Curated annotation (Swiss-Prot):
Recorded GO MF terms: electron transfer activity; heme binding; iron ion binding
Gene3D superfamilies named among the record's database cross-references: Cytochrome c/b562 (1.20.120.10)
Signal peptide positions on this chain: 1-20
Residue numbers binding heme c: 32, 137, 140-141
Taxon lineage: Bacteria, Pseudomonadati, Pseudomonadota, Alphaproteobacteria, Hyphomicrobiales
InterPro entries for this protein: Cyt_c/b562, Cyt_c_II, Cyt_c_prime
Protein name (Swiss-Prot/TrEMBL): Cytochrome c-555
Entry keywords, A to Z: Electron transport, Heme, Iron, Metal-binding, Periplasm, Signal, Transport
Source organism superkingdom: Bacteria
Gene: cycC
Subunit (UniProt): Monomer.
Post-translational modification, as annotated: Binds 1 heme c group covalently per subunit.
A Pfam family that the UniProt record links to this protein: Cytochrom_C_2
Localization terms from the record: Periplasm
Keyword Iron appears in the UniProt entry: yes
């Protein structure tokens, strides 16, 4: 009986650890998806004319990016050692092998956002803002994002 309890407890602890790791991976994925919604679903689509220019939506997207980018370092503190089930992209193990370099990619994105915040007034200025921000995001994605599918 004692042995059975030990085995069951060990299995439950192991399952709990796996679930906790998946939860961390999901939090990381959700943060990156939120940024993608702001940058690509709103800003990029406006710059391409896929959706009409909307000053309020553009300002909200920039504000959301600013908030989300500030969360990156903390959200990626822990390596979940697994990817989100059925995710298209995931974080490379390089994030945690070279955390200082990963973290150093965040301030340039924040600076790009700060430089355009409050200065977007039309599609042309939105295009310039998109390019400035996306170029900084790409600097990190080239090294630290993996295509899973």
């Amino acid at each position: 009986m004692k042995r059975t309890m030990i085995v069951v407890t060990t299995l439950l602890l192991g399952a709990g650890a796996v679930m906790a790791q998946q939860e961390v991976a999901v939090q990381q994925d959700n943060l990156m998806r939120s940024q993608a919604r702001s940058l690509y679903t709103v800003i990029l689509k406006m710059t391409k004319g896929d959706i009409p220019y909307d000053q309020k939506a553009a300002d909200e997207a920039i504000a959301n990016l600013e908030t989300d980018v500030a969360k990156i370092a903390k959200t990626f503190e822990v390596n979940p050692k697994q990817d989100v089930v059925n995710a298209t992209y995931g974080a490379s193990p390089k994030v945690w092998k070279n955390k200082a370099d990963f973290d150093s990619k965040i301030p340039p994105v924040q600076k790009a956002i700060a430089q355009v915040k409050g200065k977007i007034t039309d599609v042309a200025s939105l295009k310039a803002a998109y390019t400035a921000i996306n170029d900084r995001c790409t600097d990190c994605h080239e090294t630290y994002r993996l295509k899973l599918k």
